[in-house]
Amino acid sequence: MTPNKEDYLKCIYEIGTEVEKISNKEIASRMQVSPPAVTEMIKRMISEGLLVKDKSRGYLLTDLGSQLVSDLY
């Protein structure tokens, strides 16, 4: 896993502990990157089984994504 993906996983985890809905815009703001950059990374992470998109809650870590985050902390 790349350090960039690790940063995204940690960011998404941290946002999830603070707000109800994890949005593309929130991730971009916290990571200080453009929304299109977030969209591309999110697509990759969904295809790798690290995230899922929920209509009401935004982006959520899968069990695999959660496990990887716990390994990072």
Which residues does each PLM region occupy?
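N-terminal helix-turn-helix DNA-binding core of bacterial DNA-binding proteins
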Residues: 2-33
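Key DNA-contact positions within bacterial/archaeal DNA-binding proteins
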Residues: 36
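Short, hydrophobic-biased segments on the C-terminal half of alpha helices
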Residues: 42-43
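A short, conserved structural fragment
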Residues: 46-56
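Basic, amphipathic "hinge/linker" alpha-helix immediately C-terminal to the N-terminal HTH DNA-binding motif
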Residues: 57-73
